[in-house]
Amino acid sequence: MAMEVGYLRHSTTITNGLCCNCDPKPRGARRVQTRLPGTLCLVKDTFTSSKAKLKKPSQREIFLTSRKRLNQIQAVSTAEKEREADKTSTPPIPSSIHDISNGDHILGFGADLTEDHPGYHDLEYKRRRSRIADLAKIHKIGEPIPCVDYTSEEIRVWGHVLDTLVDLYPTHACKEYLNCYELFNFKPNYIPQLQELSEVLERSTGWHIRPVAGLLHPRDFLNGLAFRTFHSTQYVRHGSNPMYTPEPDICHEVLGHVPILADPEFADLAWAIGQASLGASEKDIWHLTKLYWYTVEFGTVKEGNEIKAFGAGLLSSFGELKHMRVGTDGFMPEFVELDPFKKMPKMSYKDGYQKRYFLCESFADAAAKLRAYSRSILKPEVQSIKFGDTPIRL
């Protein structure tokens, strides 16, 4: 029989075909070396006797370790090939919102919190998150969004965030946001249900809200925008630090994203990013994710001689809003004109406030630029999509 017992890096000293750290070959065996791709050499022992066995512990250890390492190398090689193929391959292209899952590619939700999360040590909070996430996972498109019976603690957190931010909006938020904000009549003692908000958006811009259990895969989330659907979480951030959340929660979604989606020109801007994502390569999805980050999340717009915020990451963060206008500890962020065709900088979200904001002349101008970029990467096979039973040509 033939048995693979070792692998050698070519930098290792070889004496008479053996690694200097290996035991000599068993009597009756002949040594064969087979070169593998890359910098590895596979060593095989071919036994002429069926009774020959690995008698020494060191030999068996070499066999097990080497076999495991070889499997790891082969797995890495396969993964690298798959990643290279993904960069150019075209994934299945959704033709309607029904083709997009809101639960198969969740990057984090429920009780799966990292150690640096404020609620990591709060078992009851994690259970609560998990129960709310389950409501989103059972939701069917076309059915009313399940209501969440928010607790007094969750309402307290919501009210604190709302009362803190509302004082900054008149001077820091763009006029489109302020106009749309009035449509929702937010109150500090009541957390609005997603179904109520979705109905307002449907009447104003034709957009819908779909509940989601947690952070969606970027492709799924961006694909949803192409069907004028915004995926929103329903859970509330941990009460120990009401002005901070490491991931999207209902305060961020409702105060940051929802109002501005009632503005037709902004809705077109978000829609353009979504259209570009249909059938996009992994490389293009990564670029679109950055475009989304620097517009929908942290975008700014000229308003006369001032710069105002329209991104949800700004509008749901008291500290970020102030930083945008006056800087922090003597550091002033820079403002760069939005150009979707240029390489976007690394996204920053765990090392303090943004160092750079992208600036739009107007929502209409930004939407036009994003549509031009969308047309440049849109796959030929992406001809139209469906809103309900109505096909829309792209």
Curated annotation (Swiss-Prot):
Transmembrane segments: none annotated. Forms monomers. Disruption phenotype: Mutant plants accumulate phenylalanine and caffeic acid esters. GO terms for cellular component: chloroplast. Its cofactor is Fe(2+). Fe cation binds at residues 252, 257, 297. InterPro entries: ArAA_hydroxylase, ArAA_hydroxylase_Fe/CU_BS, ArAA_hydroxylase_sf, Aro-AA_hydroxylase_C_sf, Aromatic-AA_hydroxylase_C. It is found in: Plastid, Chloroplast. Residues 1-79 form a transit peptide. GO terms for biological process: L-phenylalanine catabolic process. GO terms for molecular function: iron ion binding; phenylalanine 4-monooxygenase activity. Its EC number is 1.14.16.1. This is Phenylalanine 4-monooxygenase, chloroplastic. Keywords: Allosteric enzyme, Chloroplast, Iron, Metal-binding, Monooxygenase, Oxidoreductase, Phenylalanine catabolism, Plastid, Transit peptide. Disulfide bonds: none annotated. It comes from the Eukaryota. Residues 75-97 are annotated as: Disordered. PANTHER family: AROMATIC AMINO ACID HYDROXYLASE, PHENYLALANINE-4-HYDROXYLASE. It comes from Physcomitrium patens. Belongs to the biopterin-dependent aromatic amino acid hydroxylase family.
